[in-house]
From Swiss-Prot:
Signal peptide: none annotated. The gene is plsX. InterPro entries: FA_synthesis, Phospholipid_synth_PlsX-like. Belongs to the PlsX family. Homodimer. Probably interacts with PlsY. It comes from Legionella pneumophila subsp. pneumophila (strain Philadelphia 1 / ATCC 33152 / DSM 7513). It catalyses: a fatty acyl-[ACP] + phosphate = an acyl phosphate + holo-[ACP]. This is Phosphate acyltransferase. GO terms for cellular component: cytoplasm. One of its GO terms (biological process) is phospholipid biosynthetic process.
Amino acid sequence: MKNITIAIDAMGGDHGLEIVIPACIRAIKNNPDLKLLLVGVQDKISASLKKHGMLSCQQFTIVHASEVVTMDELPSHALRNKKDSSMRIAINLVKEGRAQACVSAGNTGALMATARYVLKTLPGIDRPAIVSELPTMGGKTRVIDLGANVDSCAEHLFQFAVMGSALIQAIENKPKPKIGLLNIGVEEIKGNDQVKRTAHMLAECSVMNYVGYVEGDHFYSGDVDLVVCDGFVGNVALKASEGLAKLLLTVLKESFSRNWLTKIAGLIALPALKHLKNRLDPSRYNGASLLGLNGIVVKSHGGANEVGFQHAIEQAVLEVKNNVVDLVRDQINDFINQGLLL
Protein backbone atom coordinates (compact mmCIF):
# COMPACT_ATOMS: atom_id res chain seq x y z
CA MET A 1 0.00 0.00 0.00
CA LYS A 2 1.32 3.45 -0.93
CA ASN A 3 0.55 7.02 0.05
CA ILE A 4 -0.56 6.37 3.59
CA THR A 5 -1.86 9.54 5.23
CA ILE A 6 -1.86 9.93 9.01
CA ALA A 7 -3.37 12.84 10.96
CA ILE A 8 -1.14 13.96 13.84
CA ASP A 9 -2.42 15.84 16.88
CA ALA A 10 0.68 18.04 16.92
CA MET A 11 -0.25 19.98 20.06
CA GLY A 12 -1.12 17.04 22.34
CA GLY A 13 0.93 15.47 25.11
CA ASP A 14 3.21 16.77 27.82
CA HIS A 15 5.77 18.18 25.36
CA GLY A 16 3.74 19.05 22.24
CA LEU A 17 5.70 20.21 19.20
CA GLU A 18 9.04 19.79 20.98
CA ILE A 19 8.67 16.01 20.66
CA VAL A 20 6.03 15.60 17.94
CA ILE A 21 7.87 17.34 15.08
CA PRO A 22 11.23 15.51 15.50
CA ALA A 23 9.31 12.23 15.83
CA CYS A 24 7.38 12.95 12.64
CA ILE A 25 10.63 13.71 10.81
CA ARG A 26 12.03 10.35 11.94
CA ALA A 27 8.85 8.61 10.77
CA ILE A 28 8.84 10.03 7.24
CA LYS A 29 12.51 9.16 6.79
CA ASN A 30 11.60 5.53 7.50
CA ASN A 31 8.49 5.68 5.30
CA PRO A 32 9.01 7.57 2.00
CA ASP A 33 5.35 7.07 1.00
CA LEU A 34 4.00 8.40 4.30
CA LYS A 35 2.20 11.75 4.39
CA LEU A 36 1.49 13.44 7.71
CA LEU A 37 -1.22 16.01 8.33
CA LEU A 38 0.12 18.11 11.21
CA VAL A 39 -2.88 19.49 13.07
CA GLY A 40 -2.45 22.45 15.40
CA VAL A 41 -1.63 26.15 15.57
CA GLN A 42 -0.28 26.90 12.09
CA ASP A 43 2.30 29.54 13.04
CA LYS A 44 3.79 27.36 15.78
CA ILE A 45 3.98 24.27 13.56
CA SER A 46 5.55 26.29 10.73
CA ALA A 47 8.15 27.73 13.09
CA SER A 48 9.02 24.26 14.39
CA LEU A 49 9.34 22.81 10.88
CA LYS A 50 11.51 25.76 9.85
CA LYS A 51 13.72 25.21 12.89
CA HIS A 52 14.34 21.64 11.72
CA GLY A 53 14.78 22.64 8.08
CA MET A 54 11.61 20.80 7.00
CA LEU A 55 9.22 23.66 6.19
CA SER A 56 9.16 22.83 2.48
CA CYS A 57 8.94 19.04 2.94
CA GLN A 58 6.19 17.66 0.68
CA GLN A 59 5.37 14.87 3.13
CA PHE A 60 4.03 17.39 5.65
CA THR A 61 0.78 19.34 5.39
CA ILE A 62 -0.29 21.75 8.12
CA VAL A 63 -3.96 21.76 9.13
CA HIS A 64 -4.76 24.72 11.37
CA ALA A 65 -6.55 24.25 14.69
CA SER A 66 -7.04 27.14 17.06
CA GLU A 67 -7.57 25.18 20.29
CA VAL A 68 -5.69 22.61 22.37
CA VAL A 69 -7.10 20.00 24.76
CA THR A 70 -5.08 20.17 27.98
CA MET A 71 -3.93 17.04 29.79
CA ASP A 72 -6.07 17.78 32.86
CA GLU A 73 -9.22 18.78 30.98
CA LEU A 74 -12.45 16.89 31.63
CA PRO A 75 -13.40 14.74 28.61
CA SER A 76 -16.94 16.11 28.65
CA HIS A 77 -15.65 19.70 28.57
CA ALA A 78 -13.28 18.95 25.69
CA LEU A 79 -16.05 17.25 23.74
CA ARG A 80 -18.52 20.11 24.17
CA ASN A 81 -16.26 23.15 24.07
CA LYS A 82 -13.12 22.28 22.07
CA LYS A 83 -14.57 21.59 18.62
CA ASP A 84 -11.64 23.35 16.95
CA SER A 85 -8.98 21.55 18.96
CA SER A 86 -6.07 19.79 17.28
CA MET A 87 -7.35 16.50 18.70
CA ARG A 88 -10.91 16.95 17.40
CA ILE A 89 -9.84 18.04 13.92
CA ALA A 90 -7.32 15.19 13.63
CA ILE A 91 -10.09 12.69 14.35
CA ASN A 92 -12.45 14.52 11.98
CA LEU A 93 -9.88 14.04 9.21
CA VAL A 94 -10.19 10.27 9.67
CA LYS A 95 -13.98 10.44 9.52
CA GLU A 96 -13.84 12.58 6.37
CA GLY A 97 -11.48 10.12 4.68
CA ARG A 98 -8.64 12.64 4.36
CA ALA A 99 -6.52 10.54 6.73
CA GLN A 100 -6.42 6.79 7.25
CA ALA A 101 -5.48 7.04 10.91
CA CYS A 102 -4.93 9.51 13.75
CA VAL A 103 -2.14 9.64 16.35
CA SER A 104 -2.33 11.69 19.54
CA ALA A 105 -0.36 11.95 22.78
CA GLY A 106 -3.13 14.03 24.32
CA ASN A 107 -5.57 13.54 27.18
CA THR A 108 -6.61 9.86 27.10
CA GLY A 109 -10.16 10.41 28.35
CA ALA A 110 -10.78 13.25 25.93
CA LEU A 111 -9.31 11.26 23.04
CA MET A 112 -11.51 8.26 23.80
CA ALA A 113 -14.65 10.36 24.23
CA THR A 114 -14.02 12.40 21.08
CA ALA A 115 -13.08 9.41 18.94
CA ARG A 116 -16.15 7.52 20.10
CA TYR A 117 -18.40 10.51 19.37
CA VAL A 118 -16.93 11.30 15.95
CA LEU A 119 -16.13 7.85 14.56
CA LYS A 120 -18.75 5.76 16.42
CA THR A 121 -18.25 2.19 17.56
CA LEU A 122 -18.46 -0.85 15.33
CA PRO A 123 -21.77 -2.77 15.33
CA GLY A 124 -21.78 -5.28 18.20
CA ILE A 125 -19.28 -3.29 20.28
CA ASP A 126 -20.54 -1.27 23.24
CA ARG A 127 -17.26 0.35 24.26
CA PRO A 128 -13.88 0.84 22.59
CA ALA A 129 -10.86 -0.52 24.44
CA ILE A 130 -7.16 0.31 24.51
CA VAL A 131 -4.68 -2.41 23.54
CA SER A 132 -0.89 -2.34 23.44
CA GLU A 133 2.03 -4.73 23.54
CA LEU A 134 4.49 -5.64 26.29
CA PRO A 135 7.86 -7.41 25.97
CA THR A 136 8.00 -11.05 27.05
CA MET A 137 10.62 -13.77 27.33
CA GLY A 138 9.59 -15.08 23.94
CA GLY A 139 8.86 -11.81 22.17
CA LYS A 140 5.73 -9.84 23.06
CA THR A 141 2.14 -10.10 24.21
CA ARG A 142 -0.77 -7.69 23.98
CA VAL A 143 -2.98 -6.47 26.83
CA ILE A 144 -6.55 -5.17 26.53
CA ASP A 145 -7.98 -2.95 28.16
CA LEU A 146 -5.34 -0.46 29.31
CA GLY A 147 -7.51 2.29 30.69
CA ALA A 148 -10.44 3.12 28.44
CA ASN A 149 -12.98 1.49 30.77
CA VAL A 150 -12.34 1.35 34.52
CA ASP A 151 -15.48 -0.72 35.12
CA SER A 152 -16.28 -3.47 32.63
CA CYS A 153 -18.95 -6.15 32.81
CA ALA A 154 -18.41 -9.69 31.51
CA GLU A 155 -20.03 -8.86 28.16
CA HIS A 156 -17.61 -6.00 27.62
CA LEU A 157 -14.59 -8.12 28.54
CA PHE A 158 -15.78 -10.74 26.05
CA GLN A 159 -16.00 -8.03 23.37
CA PHE A 160 -12.45 -6.92 24.24
CA ALA A 161 -11.25 -10.50 23.71
CA VAL A 162 -12.95 -10.65 20.30
CA MET A 163 -11.37 -7.37 19.18
CA GLY A 164 -7.92 -8.12 20.56
CA SER A 165 -7.89 -11.55 18.95
CA ALA A 166 -8.88 -10.04 15.60
CA LEU A 167 -6.09 -7.44 15.87
CA ILE A 168 -3.45 -10.10 16.45
CA GLN A 169 -4.77 -12.19 13.57
CA ALA A 170 -4.53 -9.14 11.30
CA ILE A 171 -1.09 -7.88 12.31
CA GLU A 172 0.76 -11.09 13.18
CA ASN A 173 -1.08 -13.51 10.90
CA LYS A 174 -1.87 -15.85 13.82
CA PRO A 175 -5.13 -17.69 13.04
CA LYS A 176 -5.81 -18.73 16.66
CA PRO A 177 -4.15 -16.35 19.14
CA LYS A 178 -3.96 -17.70 22.68
CA ILE A 179 -6.16 -15.67 25.02
CA GLY A 180 -5.76 -15.47 28.80
CA LEU A 181 -8.05 -13.76 31.31
CA LEU A 182 -6.22 -11.87 34.06
CA ASN A 183 -7.09 -13.10 37.54
CA ILE A 184 -5.62 -13.40 41.03
CA GLY A 185 -5.00 -17.11 40.48
CA VAL A 186 -5.29 -19.80 37.83
CA GLU A 187 -7.72 -21.97 39.81
CA GLU A 188 -11.35 -21.92 38.68
CA ILE A 189 -12.58 -20.94 42.15
CA LYS A 190 -10.52 -17.71 42.13
CA GLY A 191 -11.81 -14.31 41.03
CA ASN A 192 -14.91 -12.16 41.35
CA ASP A 193 -18.25 -12.77 39.63
CA GLN A 194 -17.33 -10.54 36.70
CA VAL A 195 -14.18 -12.53 35.94
CA LYS A 196 -15.90 -15.90 36.43
CA ARG A 197 -18.73 -14.94 34.06
CA THR A 198 -16.24 -13.78 31.46
CA ALA A 199 -14.29 -17.01 31.80
CA HIS A 200 -17.46 -19.02 31.25
CA MET A 201 -18.34 -17.01 28.12
CA LEU A 202 -14.85 -17.42 26.67
CA ALA A 203 -14.71 -21.14 27.49
CA GLU A 204 -18.06 -21.69 25.77
CA CYS A 205 -16.85 -19.93 22.61
CA SER A 206 -15.10 -22.58 20.52
CA VAL A 207 -14.17 -19.98 17.89
CA MET A 208 -11.59 -18.37 20.18
CA ASN A 209 -8.50 -20.01 21.61
CA TYR A 210 -9.11 -19.33 25.30
CA VAL A 211 -6.48 -20.99 27.51
CA GLY A 212 -7.83 -19.96 30.94
CA TYR A 213 -6.83 -17.65 33.76
CA VAL A 214 -3.43 -15.99 33.87
CA GLU A 215 -1.75 -14.15 36.74
CA GLY A 216 0.24 -10.93 36.60
CA ASP A 217 3.58 -12.64 36.02
CA HIS A 218 2.19 -14.20 32.83
CA PHE A 219 2.35 -10.75 31.25
CA TYR A 220 6.02 -11.46 30.59
CA SER A 221 6.13 -15.24 30.19
CA GLY A 222 4.95 -15.23 26.59
CA ASP A 223 2.50 -18.07 27.33
CA VAL A 224 -0.40 -16.16 25.79
CA ASP A 225 -0.79 -13.74 22.88
CA LEU A 226 -3.51 -11.63 24.53
CA VAL A 227 -4.26 -10.81 28.16
CA VAL A 228 -7.81 -9.56 28.80
CA CYS A 229 -8.64 -7.37 31.82
CA ASP A 230 -10.62 -4.29 32.76
CA GLY A 231 -9.08 -0.88 32.16
CA PHE A 232 -8.39 -0.07 35.80
CA VAL A 233 -6.27 -3.17 36.37
CA GLY A 234 -4.68 -2.98 32.92
CA ASN A 235 -3.57 0.63 33.33
CA VAL A 236 -2.07 -0.01 36.75
CA ALA A 237 -0.20 -3.04 35.39
CA LEU A 238 1.12 -1.05 32.42
CA LYS A 239 2.38 1.85 34.53
CA ALA A 240 3.95 -0.55 37.04
CA SER A 241 5.71 -2.35 34.17
CA GLU A 242 7.08 0.91 32.77
CA GLY A 243 8.30 1.95 36.21
CA LEU A 244 9.98 -1.40 36.81
CA ALA A 245 11.76 -1.27 33.45
CA LYS A 246 13.10 2.22 34.21
CA LEU A 247 14.21 1.11 37.69
CA LEU A 248 16.05 -1.92 36.31
CA LEU A 249 17.89 0.13 33.68
CA THR A 250 18.81 2.81 36.24
CA VAL A 251 20.11 0.26 38.77
CA LEU A 252 22.22 -1.45 36.09
CA LYS A 253 23.71 1.88 35.01
CA GLU A 254 24.54 2.82 38.61
CA SER A 255 26.01 -0.63 39.32
CA PHE A 256 28.44 -0.41 36.40
CA SER A 257 29.49 3.13 37.36
CA ARG A 258 30.57 2.48 40.97
CA ASN A 259 34.35 2.22 40.40
CA TRP A 260 36.97 1.58 37.73
CA LEU A 261 36.53 -2.21 37.92
CA THR A 262 32.78 -2.03 37.40
CA LYS A 263 33.32 0.47 34.58
CA ILE A 264 35.63 -1.98 32.81
CA ALA A 265 33.07 -4.74 33.35
CA GLY A 266 30.45 -2.41 31.89
CA LEU A 267 32.53 -1.85 28.76
CA ILE A 268 32.91 -5.61 28.31
CA ALA A 269 29.17 -6.11 28.81
CA LEU A 270 28.19 -3.10 26.68
CA PRO A 271 26.74 -5.06 23.71
CA ALA A 272 24.58 -7.16 26.05
CA LEU A 273 23.50 -4.06 27.99
CA LYS A 274 22.48 -2.27 24.79
CA HIS A 275 20.43 -5.31 23.80
CA LEU A 276 18.78 -5.34 27.23
CA LYS A 277 18.00 -1.63 27.04
CA ASN A 278 16.40 -2.05 23.62
CA ARG A 279 14.28 -4.95 24.87
CA LEU A 280 13.04 -3.12 27.98
CA ASP A 281 12.87 0.50 26.80
CA PRO A 282 9.18 1.52 27.22
CA SER A 283 9.44 3.92 24.26
CA ARG A 284 9.84 0.94 21.92
CA TYR A 285 6.39 -0.28 22.94
CA ASN A 286 4.64 3.08 22.81
CA GLY A 287 1.49 3.37 20.74
CA ALA A 288 -1.77 1.91 22.02
CA SER A 289 -4.66 1.21 19.67
CA LEU A 290 -8.23 2.31 20.38
CA LEU A 291 -10.07 -0.77 19.16
CA GLY A 292 -13.76 -0.94 18.35
CA LEU A 293 -14.05 2.30 16.37
CA ASN A 294 -14.90 2.97 12.73
CA GLY A 295 -11.37 4.21 12.17
CA ILE A 296 -7.80 3.84 13.38
CA VAL A 297 -6.80 5.93 16.40
CA VAL A 298 -3.46 5.37 18.15
CA LYS A 299 -2.72 6.82 21.58
CA SER A 300 0.85 7.75 22.42
CA HIS A 301 2.00 8.07 26.02
CA GLY A 302 1.68 11.71 27.03
CA GLY A 303 5.29 11.87 28.18
CA ALA A 304 6.75 9.90 25.25
CA ASN A 305 10.09 10.91 23.77
CA GLU A 306 10.88 11.19 20.04
CA VAL A 307 11.43 7.46 19.64
CA GLY A 308 8.24 6.69 21.52
CA PHE A 309 6.04 9.00 19.46
CA GLN A 310 7.66 7.73 16.28
CA HIS A 311 6.74 4.20 17.35
CA ALA A 312 3.12 5.31 17.80
CA ILE A 313 3.13 6.61 14.22
CA GLU A 314 4.64 3.33 13.03
CA GLN A 315 1.87 1.45 14.85
CA ALA A 316 -0.73 3.49 12.96
CA VAL A 317 1.03 2.76 9.65
CA LEU A 318 1.08 -0.96 10.50
CA GLU A 319 -2.65 -0.98 11.21
CA VAL A 320 -3.44 0.85 7.98
CA LYS A 321 -1.31 -1.56 5.94
CA ASN A 322 -3.06 -4.55 7.52
CA ASN A 323 -6.60 -3.15 7.17
CA VAL A 324 -7.16 -3.68 10.88
CA VAL A 325 -10.54 -1.95 11.11
CA ASP A 326 -12.01 -4.00 8.25
CA LEU A 327 -10.68 -7.26 9.67
CA VAL A 328 -11.94 -6.49 13.18
CA ARG A 329 -15.32 -5.55 11.70
CA ASP A 330 -15.45 -8.83 9.74
CA GLN A 331 -14.61 -10.83 12.86
CA ILE A 332 -17.31 -9.05 14.85
CA ASN A 333 -19.87 -9.62 12.08
CA ASP A 334 -19.04 -13.34 12.13
CA PHE A 335 -19.70 -13.41 15.87
CA ILE A 336 -22.97 -11.51 15.40
CA ASN A 337 -24.11 -13.94 12.69
CA GLN A 338 -23.35 -16.87 15.01
CA GLY A 339 -25.30 -15.25 17.85
CA LEU A 340 -22.18 -14.78 19.97
CA LEU A 341 -22.54 -10.99 19.99
CA LEU A 342 -25.71 -8.90 19.94
